[in-house]
Every structure is written in C-alpha cells, then in structure tokens.
C-alpha cells in the first residue's frame, strides 16, 4: 500500500531546470524566486552544467526499490546520495517503531507525569502500545521521553504536557509524510560519484556540510533567510570568490533607507558608515559627491534611483572579508559577516543569502588552502575548479533510532503535503 501511495504522490513531482531571469541591477540583496517555480521540494537548477545533471535524474530508475533496499542504493554509479539512503532507512525504522501503534485520541487535560492514574493515563498507555491499568510508571516515562526526543518536542522530560499530547493526537502518518517529503528532497542531492567535492547548505538546520566523495568532512553553522525572505532551494556552481568586496545597496533601500538617513543625519552619514555614491551601475561608473544628489527627490519619487550607493571594504562591511559568488539571477551567494555574535542566536534572519560562521575554513577547503591576503578591493579569485552548491531544506535528520524531527521554520513541509499526497489522509505502513 505504501509503495502505491508513494508512487502516486512522488511520481507527479518533476525537477525544475529553470532558465535564469533577465539580469537587472539589484544590488547585493536577493530577489524573489518566480511564483511559477514551486519551492518546498524542487531545486531551481540555475547553471547549465547543473541542469544537465537534473535532466539525467528526472526519471529515477527503481526509486522505491532503492528506498526499501538501502543495500541496493549503495551499489553502482549514480546510486542515490547517502543522505537519501539514511532518511529512507529512517522512514522504515520510524514506521516499525511508531507507525504500528494504536491511533488513540487523548483528550485535553492536566499535565500527565509519573505517578498519575486515570482514564487519560490509560489512553496514553494504549496509544504508546502498553496495556492499561499500570498508571504513569517508569516504563511509560521512558517511552514518552523517547517519543519526545524523536519528534523534536522540548523539553525532553518524560512529562506528557500539551505539546506532547497534541503530537500524539496528530498521528504517526503525519510524521511519516514529513519524513517522505524530506526523503524526496534528499533525492534531489547529487547521486554518488557525480562530483568529487560539493557543498550542501541546509536552510532547515541553518548548517553547511562539505562533502568529499560523498562523505561529509566538515560542517559549520550558517545564517540563512528568514521566513519572509527564504533562502531558495537551488543548485548552482560556485566559480570564484571576491576578497574585500563592496556591498552594493539595493535601489529599493537607497530610496527607502539611505535617503531617510541623509535627512536625519546629514551627509556625514556616508562618511560615518563608509558609503560612497556612484553615478550609475556601469562597470566604470565614477564616484560622485553625495551633495550633488537630490536625496529629498529620491525619497519622494515613485521611481527607483539610477545612482549606486555602495559600502567600502573593511571590518564594517556587511559582506565581511570575502564573498563567494555563484552566478544566478536570484542574488544568492555565500559570504563572511562582521556580526559573528549572531551565530549564537536565531540563525534565520538574513534576506536570503548565506552567512558563513568561518569563511577562512570554508575558503581553505574550496581553494585547497587559504588565498593570500590582499588589501585591494574587489579582488576576484577564481576557484581551481567550480564547486557545486546544493541549497536544500531538511526538517528531518537521521538519528540513532531512525530519525529526529526538527522545526519547519519556512513552513515548507505543510506546503509540500498537497504536492506529494493530494487528498490522501494517511501514509500506509512500509511493512
């Protein structure tokens, strides 16, 4: 039954090899992915070389056989990515451990913990596969603790509070579907032996993992887009880095923010925050005096300004010391940041670009060694060879006992449900 359901759900999902949009001056900030491209499962394949990989994978052979035979998935060239294999195995383990339990609804009520007795405790015991009548004993405590750990319910304290009861009432099929969605996302990652080296940026976990011959050799925290300015799911080739980059302020911000700051702080704003003004967006545009610009007119105009405002390289620069460029028309790239303290808090706060926790370590990996430092601005440093960057979104991770669920900061799991399962209410057992 599960094979049939997954075939009907997944067979309708096609990979997207999207042609780039016409380039327009946008500054160093992302632009929205077109609404015609459905995010949640599919990548946008920006680079022609990546698109050719996509075409080879649009009709995978024996998808379900590989999924339910992880040994087969490891054999041969172009076998699915190891992340796919781990999540597929995790789905099996989840179904075996949690998918076979009785679907019993537990009514709302007080928190349940060790020593409690009553009808709701009996229902909780039955829901988790135990016989009624034993009360909230040590065995039930251990199972609730395990359930909380797998399903990302904090704190993991063995107490059946409101969140735990709500999760149990949601049913195992909801979570099995979430795993299946993540399995499908992982299938979009490169097959084994496709690339010697590549990077997976997971905006679901706000982490970047560096792969050599399909083995993760390093990982680091990253800051990614917020729920309003999501980092898109896409595959691109990183071709060069730029040392000591300028930050080009988007025309929208020049109109809405820069002009406002000039009104509030005067022309000293440019000196204090290391900005300069250029006549236009041309490659050889001259630097002009800010006092020659009618900032009041820019603020009130319905048109975007044609001048360019950019922040000079230095420790104050929003791009940090290095920017890793990946040609795409969505304005997405990886870069350093001067605000290292931000990595200790909420990491879903950027406008869509990816800020690296340790750009020096990252640069040392992509170049083979850290490039020689230079004081010259905008120094382009070609990579020895292009490095594929896969920007995905995973809300389930492999765990010691199958999988561990993580938050869904972009809400893409709910968005992907109808794409994959339509009106289906349940995901049948893999058994």
Go through each PLM region and give its residues.
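Bacterial N-terminal signal peptides that target proteins for export
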Residues: 1-10
């Amino acid at each position: 039954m599960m094979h049939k359901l997954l075939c009907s759900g997944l067979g309708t999902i096609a990979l997207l090899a999207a042609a780039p949009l016409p380039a327009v001056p946008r500054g160093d900030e992302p632009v929205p992915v077109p609404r015609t491209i459905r995010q949640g499962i599919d990548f946008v394949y920006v680079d022609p070389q990546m698109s050719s990989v996509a075409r080879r994978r649009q009709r995978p052979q024996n998808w379900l056989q590989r999924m339910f035979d992880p040994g087969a998935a490891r054999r041969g060239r172009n076998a699915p990515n190891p992340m796919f294999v781990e999540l597929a195995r995790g789905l099996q383990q989840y179904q075996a451990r949690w998918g076979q339990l009785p679907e019993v609804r537990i009514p709302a009520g007080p928190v349940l913990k060790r020593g409690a007795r009553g009808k709701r405790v009996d229902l909780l015991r039955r829901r988790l596969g135990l016989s009624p009548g034993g009360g909230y004993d040590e065995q039930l405590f251990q199972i609730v603790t395990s359930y909380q750990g797998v399903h990302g319910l904090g704190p993991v304290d063995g107490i059946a509070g409101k969140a735990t009861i709500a999760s149990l009432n949601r049913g195992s099929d909801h979570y099995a579907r979430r795993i299946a969605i993540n399995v499908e996302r992982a299938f979009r990652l490169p097959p084994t032996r496709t690339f010697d080296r590549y990077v997976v940026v997971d905006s679901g976990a706000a982490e970047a993992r560096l792969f050599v011959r399909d083995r993760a050799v390093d990982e680091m925290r990253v800051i990614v887009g917020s729920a309003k300015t999501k980092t898109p799911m896409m595959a691109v080739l990183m071709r060069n880095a730029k040392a000591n980059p300028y930050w080009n302020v988007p025309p929208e911000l020049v109109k809405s923010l820069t002009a406002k700051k000039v009104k509030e702080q005067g022309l000293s704003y440019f000196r204090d925050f290391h900005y300069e003004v250029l006549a236009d967006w041309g490659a050889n545009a001259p630097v002009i005096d800010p006092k020659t610009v009618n900032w009041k007119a820019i603020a009130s105009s319905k048109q975007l300004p044609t001048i360019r405002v950019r922040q000079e390289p230095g420790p104050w620069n929003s791009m940090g010391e290095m920017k890793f460029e990946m040609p795409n028309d969505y304005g997405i790239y990886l870069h350093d940041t001067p605000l290292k303290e931000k990595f200790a808090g909420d990491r879903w706060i950027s406008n869509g670009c990816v800020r690296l926790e340790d750009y020096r370590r990252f640069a040392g990996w992509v170049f083979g060694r850290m490039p020689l430092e230079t004081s010259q601005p905008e120094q382009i440093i070609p990579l020895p060879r292009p490095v594929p960057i896969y920007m995905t979104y995973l809300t389930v991770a492999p765990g010691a006992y199958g999988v561990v669920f993580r938050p869904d900061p972009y809400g893409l799991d709910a968005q992907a449900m109808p794409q994959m399962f339509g009106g289906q209410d349940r995901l049948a057992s893999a058994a």
